[in-house]
């Protein structure tokens, strides 16, 4: 039991520790609430909190207090007390509170209930049980309460450890049930031999016929197990059970071993199963033989017993029916195997429910008539029913006894409670009676006082208010005094804070002085080094002699100082031992040696003679220089290593990226080369088609002259239509291309990978190239960019070729018609061609030499209608970008075929002329003009404008005078000069400026092109006689009439041929437009890639420059390292010389020790000040608590005043009652007056009647009497009325005074509340001030800690200096003999 209780207590402690968040072993209110919620004690939570914590919100409890309070609360809730008389009910309540853990048929496992014994055994063992229960009464109620909080985990653990014990419990209970049921012996008639467990077990063994020798074998143990319902045990389980019971290992189980194993849980008690486990042995084991004559008697007795009973109560669910499987299962438990045949023999269906009452009567009938098997089944049923009912009756009897005991205990407790409640009620009644009497007496006195002495009460109220006001004023003065004291303390704390800040400032100043002294020492050290390291010093020998003398003197002084230092150290240790421990400085060391802060001691002792002064500070500076040098060296080495690693990583990354870019560039270049080859093939095909068309045009030009006349307007009309369609289509294609290009550019602008791609394109295709090749590649790129104005060269070639073809046709036609007109026309051709070329070549590369023949090139390549001029401003940058891309893709020697095309055309034109001087023989001016006009420039615009204006202002389109070839050459030379000048400006300017100039040139030239195209279209629609000039009209009048018919036929034929050729030409133009658009897109892409390539090249150059700069810095750092190594060697040699001067440290050791003592004293003073601050803070907290208490007192006073105010209100209400009574009496008196008046009137009326009857004298007398009586009555009424009015006024004045008093009291209370609020605000302000003081104190403590840390650092440095002094002394002792010997 103790182990089980300890287990529960340990579980409770684990839950308790899980709620202990602070780890202190105590729980506050919140943590205790959380613990109760974990233990599912929501109902007991308020009682438990009140029991453990009370009304204190800051109280805490430990585990023992919680355990005691927890058990007490649970026991009080359950109605259980730790007493002798209710320990058994605790045990029964604890056993019945926990349900079984596992149910298997009729077996229940895991319950801790203890089966009750029979009444006789209980009566026999009641005395020892009471003794054992008395020994366990101290913890039974605790276990009952602790079992309620047992976790499921502990139940599962306990289940595994106590499984065997539970089985033994069930076995023990089954033994008793078997003993009572199978053999028909009721529990009340148990023999005395079965009073003990040993006798019961021995009796069972005798009944089973086993254990005759006092021991059980394995087979006999199997029989016993079958008898108690464990017939399903296998051989291995039986062997394990036998080995467990056989503790001595002799191969047998004795009675004591069996009893010990059976009652191992609690051997002092014979336990009984909490559930009814039916014995499963065969019915034949205890069946009464049929031969004996006891069968009928047994049956009759059973029938008589069961005549008023129903069978199958255990399986009856209240409906009177049961499943056949249930009946068969019950019979199989009783050992009857052929239950199905029995049911069928009794005419019951196996598939439907069985009526239990009919089955009972059938069995009852069959019990007397049917054979032995049916009788056995009936007997088994009756036996089972009787045993079940008997168990139920016994259980009810036990429950009745327990309920009776519980009722008796409850009645006892109720009696005690009733007594306590009677006492409480009596005391409460007495108190209430006393209070009521006291209140009645007080109210009576107050009523009497209010009725008689209202003025006195008012004075009393005024006096009370005055006293309260004085008390409040006194409280306010006291609080003001406390506030003044707090302010004084605050000022003191602020002063202390300022003082500490000043001390910190002084320490900082001292540190700055030490730094300045260090700088001074460094200068001295440099001076000494300069002086000492001079090899040509003349006084070196004399100085060594003086050094020897000085060393001897210093040795003597060192001995004296060391003796004195020892004496001071001894005195210091004595003083240190006398000091209290709590005032010791944390930075004190027992050896008593301290170091002075740098710069606080003397400057040192200098050497004699002419040598520079060398002090101890110089030595310190040398040490610092060495340390600084070492730090610099390590930092430099780390930086050098870091930069080397970075440079190596950069090189690796650069090589990797360069290889990737080379590969990607190779792939891109291969793709671009393939595209370029395709475009060249397409260009060659288009040139072939153009040449074929030109030849066809030349063939048609050699035909008869009338054919040319009819063909010209058709050609012009067809070409105008083609030009318009081509212009609209090309404009649409350009818009789409521009939209796609802008989208691609916006998308590609965010892709950094394009930059790598362009860089790869710029790299050479085979491995890394030297810088010379890269430079040459950049030059080539710049040259290609400079050749951007030649982007429209091929279009110019096509325009020139077409214009020349038209010109050849016109020349041939004019030659056949009229020689002079043809000559004039041929002379005008070069001029017109140049003028048109200069006016239109700059925008689209067009060169139409005659207005009538310019439609084809305009329709092909450069549409110039009004729509184009409207979009000139928006399309200018895109045309420039297309020209730039074409310039980048077209190689440098590309202009050669362009100049070759016009030369061929001029060579074809030469034989057609009349004279050799008419047509120029050199084609260079046209090539030059074409090349010059293609380049954009602002300087060319005035010339082009003047030429265009001159050509437009002429009176006629065809000039008859001849122009020599010299004028053409002059114009070509001027154009060549313009081209060179623009080339120079291009080389000087940037690419952006050139593009802007080109845009301006295009904008200036497009209106001319537009006017020209409109004029051409207008002329194409006019009749032939309006299109030609005056010479042409004169030529037409000279034609003969017979030739008109032939010319018409020939013209119709040529017209049909030209229509077919025009259709074919239109298809070719469409294909060329598609290819040109594709080529322009490719050129744009290539131009963009080339720009990105240039940017990446720039980045690459910058990265290389950075690498070169890093390499140069690396070389400089290496040089610095070498210089520092040399300096280090030099410093080592200098240190060997400076080590001789360490003797000067001995003079300053005493001063350092004194300074350390001073610092220790300052630290002790700081500690004392900190203690004072703590004391002041405690005082402030106490004063704050007093202020809070005073505030609480004032709140209590306010509550008292409120109570008095309520009393006054009640008195006012009580005064209102007499006021109402007085008003009622006044009304009654008024009614009486009215009644008197009525009576008076009646009396007067009667008197008048009597007067009439009475004589006049008598009447006069009566009048006088009546007047006298009336006056008296009036006086009395007036007096009564005045009295009533006075009373009313007095009551009204009292009420008003009471209301005034109430108002004054309310005002006073409000003033007090306001004052208390102000006081509370002041208290909060004082709290804030206290918090600020705490913060300042914390800052001061931190500053003190910092000073202490500095002091510790000074002590450490002093120790280091002492060690250095020792080492220097050793060095001096070694060096001094050598110096003296020299």
Curated annotation (Swiss-Prot):
A motif (D-box) lies at residues 633-641. Keywords: Calcium, Coiled coil, Cytoplasm, Cytoskeleton, Metal-binding, Microtubule, Phosphoprotein, Repeat, Ubl conjugation. It is found in: Cytoplasm, Cytoskeleton, Microtubule organizing center, Centrosome; Cytoplasm. GO terms for biological process: microtubule anchoring at centrosome. Expressed in KYSE-150 esophageal carcinoma, HeLa cervical carcinoma and U2OS osteosarcoma cells. Expression is regulated in a cell cycle-dependent manner and peaks during G2/M phase (at protein level). Expressed in fetal heart, skeletal muscle, liver, lung and cochlea, and in adult brain, testis, kidney and retina. Involved in the microtubule organization in interphase cells. Overexpression induces the fragmentation of the Golgi, and causes lysosomes to disperse toward the cell periphery; it also interferes with mitotic spindle assembly. Involved in vesicle transport in photoreceptor cells. May play a role in ovarian carcinogenesis. The modification Phosphoserine is found at residue 148. Residues 7-42, 41-76, 196-231, 233-268 form the EF-hand domain. Ca(2+) binds at residues 246, 248, 250, 252, 257. Phosphorylated by PLK1 which disrupts its centrosome association and interaction with gamma-tubulin. Ubiquitinated by the APC/C complex leading to its degradation. Residues 991-1004 have a biased composition (Low complexity). One of its GO terms (molecular function) is calcium ion binding. Residues 384-424, 484-579, 616-699, 1046-1375 form a coiled coil. It comes from the Eukaryota. GO terms for cellular component: centrosome; cytosol; microtubule. Residues 144-164, 857-969, 982-1006 are annotated as: Disordered. A motif (KEN box) lies at residues 495-497. Interacts with gamma-tubulin and TUBGCP4. Interacts with anaphase promoting complex/cyclosome (APC/C). Interacts with CDC20 and FZR1. Isoform 2 interacts with LCA5 and USH2A. Isoform 2 interacts with DZANK1. Pfam families: EF-hand_7. The KEN and D (destructive) boxes are required for the cell cycle-controlled NINL degradation by the APC/C pathway. This is Ninein-like protein. Residues 150-164 have a biased composition (Basic and acidic residues).
């Amino acid at each position: 039991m103790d182990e089980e209780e300890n287990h529960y207590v340990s579980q409770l402690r684990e839950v308790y520790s899980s709620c202990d968040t602070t780890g202190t072993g105590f729980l506050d209110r919140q943590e205790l609430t959380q613990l109760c919620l974990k233990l599912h004690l929501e109902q007991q939570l308020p009682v438990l909190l009140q029991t453990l914590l009370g009304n204190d919100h800051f109280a805490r409890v430990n585990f023992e207090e919680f355990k005691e309070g927890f058990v007490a609360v649970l026991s009080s809730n359950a109605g259980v007390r730790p007493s002798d008389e209710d320990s058994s009910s605790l045990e029964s309540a604890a056993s019945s509170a926990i349900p079984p853990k596992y149910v298997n048929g009729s077996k229940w496992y895991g319950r801790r209930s203890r089966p009750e014994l029979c009444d006789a055994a209980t009566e026999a063992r009641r005395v020892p049980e009471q003794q054992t229960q008395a020994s366990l009464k101290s913890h039974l109620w605790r276990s009952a309460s602790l079992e309620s909080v047992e976790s499921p985990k502990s139940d599962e653990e306990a289940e595994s450890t106590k499984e065997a014990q539970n089985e033994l419990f069930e076995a023990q209970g089954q033994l008793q049930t078997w003993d009572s049921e199978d053999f028909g012996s009721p529990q009340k008639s148990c023999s005395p031999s079965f009073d003990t467990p040993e006798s019961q077990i021995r009796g069972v063994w005798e009944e089973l016929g086993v254990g005759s020798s006092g021991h059980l074998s394995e087979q006999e143990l199997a029989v016993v197990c079958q008898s108690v319902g464990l017939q399903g045990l296998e051989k291995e389980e039986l062997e394990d059970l036998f080995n467990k019971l056989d503790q001595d290992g002799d191969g047998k189980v004795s009675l004591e071993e069996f009893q010990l194993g059976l009652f191992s849980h609690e051997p002092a008690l014979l336990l009984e199963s909490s559930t009814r486990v039916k014995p499963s042995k065969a019915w034949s084991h205890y069946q009464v033989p049929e031969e004996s004559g006891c069968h009928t008697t047994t049956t009759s007795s059973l029938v008589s017993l069961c005549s008023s009973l129903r069978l199958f109560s255990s399986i009856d669910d209240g409906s009177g029916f049961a499943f056949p499987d249930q009946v068969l299962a019950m019979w199989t438990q009783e050992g009857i195997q052929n239950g199905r045949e029995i049911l069928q023999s009794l005419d019951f269906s196996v598939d439907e429910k069985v009526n239990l009452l009919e089955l009972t009567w059938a069995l009852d009938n069959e019990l007397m008539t049917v054979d032995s098997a049916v009788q056995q089944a009936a007997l088994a049923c009756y036996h089972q029913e009787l045993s079940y009912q008997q168990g139920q009756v016994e259980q009810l009897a036990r429950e009745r006894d327990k309920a009776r005991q519980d009722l008796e205990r409850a009645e006892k407790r109720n009696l005690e409670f009733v007594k306590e409640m009677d006492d409480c009620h009596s005391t409460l009644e007495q108190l209430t009676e006393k209070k009521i009497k006291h209140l009645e007496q007080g109210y009576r006195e107050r009523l009497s006082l209010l009725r008689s002495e209202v003025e006195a009460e008012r004075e009393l109220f005024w006096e009370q208010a005055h006293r309260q006001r004085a008390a409040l004023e006194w409280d306010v003065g006291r609080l003001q005094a406390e506030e003044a004291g707090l302010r004084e303390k605050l000022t003191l704390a602020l002063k202390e804070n300022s003082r500490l800040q000043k001390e910190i400032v002084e320490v900082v100043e001292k540190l700055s002085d030490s730094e300045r002294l260090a700088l001074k020492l460094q200068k001295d050290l440099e001076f000494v080094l300069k002086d000492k390291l001079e090899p040509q010093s003349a006084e070196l020998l004399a100085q060594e002699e003086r050094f020897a003398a000085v060393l001897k003197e210093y040795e003597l002084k060192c001995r004296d100082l060391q003796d004195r230092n020892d004496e001071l150290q001894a005195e210091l240790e004595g003083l240190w031992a006398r000091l209290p421990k709590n005032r010791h400085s944390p930075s004190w060391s027992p050896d008593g040696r301290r170091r002075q802060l740098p710069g606080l001691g003397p400057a040192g002792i200098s050497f004699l003679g002419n040598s520079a002064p060398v002090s101890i500070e110089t030595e310190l500076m040398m040490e610092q220089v060495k340390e600084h040098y070492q730090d610099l060296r390590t930092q430099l080495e780390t930086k050098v290593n870091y930069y080397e690693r970075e440079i190596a990583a950069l090189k690796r990354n650069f090589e990797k990226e360069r290889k990737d870019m080379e590969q990607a560039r190779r792939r891109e270049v291969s793709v671009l080369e393939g595209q370029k080859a395709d475009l060249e093939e397409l260009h060659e095909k288009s040139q072939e088609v153009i040449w074929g068309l030109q030849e066809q045009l030349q063939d048609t030009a050699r035909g008869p002259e009338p054919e040319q006349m009819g063909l010209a307007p058709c050609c012009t009309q067809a070409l105008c239509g083609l030009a318009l369609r081509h212009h609209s289509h090309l404009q649409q294609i350009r818009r789409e291309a521009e939209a796609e290009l802008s989208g691609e550019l916006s998308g590609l602008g965010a892709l950094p990978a394009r930059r790598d791609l362009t860089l790869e394109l710029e790299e050479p295709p085979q491995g890394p190239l030297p810088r010379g090749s890269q430079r040459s590649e950049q030059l080539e790129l710049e040259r290609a960019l400079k050749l951007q104005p030649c982007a429209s060269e091929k279009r110019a070639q096509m325009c020139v070729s077409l214009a020349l073809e038209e010109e050849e046709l016109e020349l041939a036609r004019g030659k056949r018609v009229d020689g002079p007109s043809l000559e004039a026309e041929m002379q005008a051709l070069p001029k017109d061609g140049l003028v048109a070329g200069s006016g239109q070549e700059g925008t689209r590369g067009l060169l139409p030499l005659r207005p009538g023949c310019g439609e084809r090139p305009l329709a092909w390549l450069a549409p110039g209608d009004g729509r184009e001029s409207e979009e000139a401003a928006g399309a200018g940058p895109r045309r420039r970008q297309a020209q730039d891309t074409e310039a980048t893709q077209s190689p440098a020697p590309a202009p050669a075929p362009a100049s070759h095309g016009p030369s061929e055309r001029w060579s074809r034109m030469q034989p057609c002329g009349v004279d050799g001087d008419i047509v120029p023989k050199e084609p260079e001016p046209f090539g030059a003009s074409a090349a010059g006009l293609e380049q954009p420039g602002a300087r060319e615009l005035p010339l082009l404008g003047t030429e265009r204006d001159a050509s437009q202002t002429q009176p006629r389109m065809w000039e008859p005078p001849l122009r020599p070839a010299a004028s053409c050459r002059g114009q070509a030379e001027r154009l060549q000069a313009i081209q060179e000048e623009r080339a120079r400006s291009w080389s000087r300017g940037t690419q952006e400026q050139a593009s802007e100039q080109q845009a301006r040139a295009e904008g200036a030239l497009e209106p001319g092109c537009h006017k020209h195209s409109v004029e051409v279209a207008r002329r194409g629609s006019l009749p032939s006689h309006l299109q030609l000039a005056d010479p042409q009209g004169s030529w037409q009048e000279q034609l003969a009439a017979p030739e008109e018919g032939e010319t018409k036929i020939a013209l119709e034929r040529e017209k049909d041929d030209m229509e077919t050729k025009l259709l074919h030409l239109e298809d070719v133009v469409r294909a060329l437009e598609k290819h040109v658009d594709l080529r322009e897109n490719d050129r744009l892409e290539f131009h963009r890639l080339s720009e990105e390539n240039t940017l990446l090249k720039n980045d690459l150059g910058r990265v290389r420059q950075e690498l070169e700069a890093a390499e140069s810095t690396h070389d400089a750092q290496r040089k610095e390292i070498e210089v520092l190594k040399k300096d280090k060697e030099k410093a080592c040699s200098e240190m060997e010389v400076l080590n001789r001067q360490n003797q000067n440290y001995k003079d300053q050791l005493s001063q350092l020790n004194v300074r350390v003592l001073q610092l220790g004293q300052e630290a002790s003073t700081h500690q004392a000040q900190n203690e004072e601050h703590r004391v002041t803070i405690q005082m402030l907290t106490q004063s704050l608590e007093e202020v809070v208490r005073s505030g609480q007192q004032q709140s209590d006073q306010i509550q008292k005043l409120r109570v008095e105010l309520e009393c006054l209100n009640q008195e006012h209400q009580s005064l209102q009652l007499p006021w109402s009574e007085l008003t009622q009496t006044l009304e009654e008196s008024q009614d009486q007056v009215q009644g008197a008046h009525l009576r008076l009137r009646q009396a007067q009326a009667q008197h008048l009647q009597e007067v009439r009857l009475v004589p006049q004298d008598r009447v006069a007398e009566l009048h006088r009497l009546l007047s006298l009586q009336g006056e008296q009555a009036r006086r009395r009424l007036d007096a009564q009325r005045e009295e009533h009015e006075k009373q009313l006024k007095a009551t009204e004045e009292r009420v008003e005074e009471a209301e005034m008093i109430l108002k004054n009291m309310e005002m006073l209370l409000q003033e007090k509340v306001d004052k208390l609020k102000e006081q509370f605000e002041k208290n909060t302000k004082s709290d804030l001030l206290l918090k600020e003081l705490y913060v300042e104190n914390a800052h001061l403590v931190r500053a003190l800690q910092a000073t202490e840390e500095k002091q510790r650092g000074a002590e450490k440095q002093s120790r280091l200096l002492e060690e250095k002094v020792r080492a220097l002394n050793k060095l001096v002792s070694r060096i001094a003999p050598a110096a003296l010997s020299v």
